[in-house]
Amino acid sequence: MVVGDVTTGTELLVIGGGPGGYVAAIRGAQLGLDTTLVERDAYGGTCLNHGCIPSKALISASDVAHDARQAESMGVFADPAVDMAGMTEWKDGVVTRLTRGVESLCKNAGVNLVEGTAEFVDDGTVRVAHGGEGQGSESLSFEHAIVATGSRPMAVPGFEFDGEHILSSKDALALESVPEKLLVVGAGYIGMELSTVFAKLGAEVTVVEMLDDVLPGYEDDIATVVRDRAEELGIDFNFGEAADNWEETDEGIRVQTVDEDEVVTEYNAEKCLVAVGREPVTDTLALDNIDLQTDENGVIPTDDQCRTAFESVFAVGDVAGEPMLAHKAMAEGEVAARAAAGEPAAFDHQAIPAAVFTDPEIATVGMTESEAEAAGFEPVIGQMPVRANGRALTVNEKEGFVRVVADADEEFLLGAQIVGPEASELIAELGLGIEMGARLEDIAGTIHTHPTLSEAVHEAAAAARGEAVHTR
């Protein structure tokens, strides 16, 4: 690469080194394309550095502390002390190891790595600004470009993130002490995961949510299981309230919310975590220079090959819209790289799993019963309660269920919903089933190891056929 006015070229340019971007870059290089990856921060993106990995590390650590306190029924007695600074240091070590791993994978694949912020000059050129003022820039021409710039936490008007009083999820994951009182605005998956973490670590947690329940978009019986467990942890929920304003106090902050009747409620807390969703990051790309439009949510529209309105420009991951999931971004990155290399490729949305790492976990894939009906199917349902699974009881778990949705006529698997221990691991079998066109008999006819949680998947499929043995 030459710094200055000279333009150098690459066949495949990837902007953003998160899950979608680094996978696209590695696959492009493996397919023989001269590939360049531009990243302005840390390799691995939000997922690895400020999202999926660090949050799950803290979830695991908080589970250890909580489980130790709850082990008396198993004849184990302990009173663990929490060192949040030490926990954060351990979490950061995990992140550093994986970030270095991603960089190493890219280098080993032959990907050219460039640090900086890329913006489009035209539909065949970007300018990359390196670091801060005086660090210089360079121009890169490309045959194909893949935009994978990810997303960032959305702020509530008047509640801009300051890292001290008003926290984003990124800020919350970097805390070195447990807040005595934590107010969480938003009861979606991020708000619920982090509320659970800090409640288990000893914080007094209050959640306010505009809607009438936790986890908007999930079925009521799933949300109920998670909300009930959260309330057992001491989390206080207040629904139908919107954050309105806040002020600093001697003890921390005072937040006012307002409901639809204009009733104002005040909450005192040490810190306020705002978790109301995420928005695509496109403002650094100078999309106006190539007249590439985004929709009203800032999403770059794409086709089933992840191509934008420009044949040479692709978009993958969060900038390409919901669901904003790392594994969806990776799959799209694969598709875009193959399409750029001239290989046949298309992205299929029907079997994208999703997981929420609450207590208990939630995992879903494919259609719900109502979605199947709306799609014209006559669905049949099979459900297995967690409390009827022997292995679940041996790990002191009893709440939740495994549910499968199938077509009543042909018994093709259409979807699944799990709430319970290790749901995020169990869902893979059912995602594979949907992907390969499996029928209920394929799941029910497969011998599952005993005693394991996976037997609940087997039993749910059998229940849908009227052949359940271990549940009524």
From Swiss-Prot:
Cofactor: how and how many bound: Binds 1 FAD per subunit.
Required co-factors: FAD
Keywords annotated in UniProt: Cytoplasm, Disulfide bond, FAD, Flavoprotein, NAD, Oxidoreductase, Redox-active center
Compartment(s) where it occurs, according to its Swiss-Prot or TrEMBL record: Cytoplasm
Cysteines engaged in disulfide bonds, as pairs: C47-C52
Pfam families: Pyr_redox_2, Pyr_redox_dim
Recorded GO MF terms: dihydrolipoyl dehydrogenase (NADH) activity; flavin adenine dinucleotide binding
Catalytic residues of the enzyme: H450
Reaction catalysed by this enzyme: N(6)-[(R)-dihydrolipoyl]-L-lysyl-[protein] + NAD(+) = N(6)-[(R)-lipoyl]-L-lysyl-[protein] + NADH + H(+)
Entry binding sites for NAD(+): G186, A187, G188, Y189, I190, E209, A275, V276, G277, R278
Annotated binding of FAD, by residue: E39, R40, D41, A42, Y43, G44, G45, T46, C47, K56, A118, D318, A326
Listed GO biological process terms: 2-oxoglutarate metabolic process
Tagged with keyword Oxidoreductase: yes
EC number of the protein: 1.8.1.4
One GO cellular component term: cytoplasm
Subunit-structure text: Homodimer.
Note: The active site is a redox-active disulfide bond.
Family: Belongs to the class-I pyridine nucleotide-disulfide oxidoreductase family.
Protein name: Dihydrolipoyl dehydrogenase 2
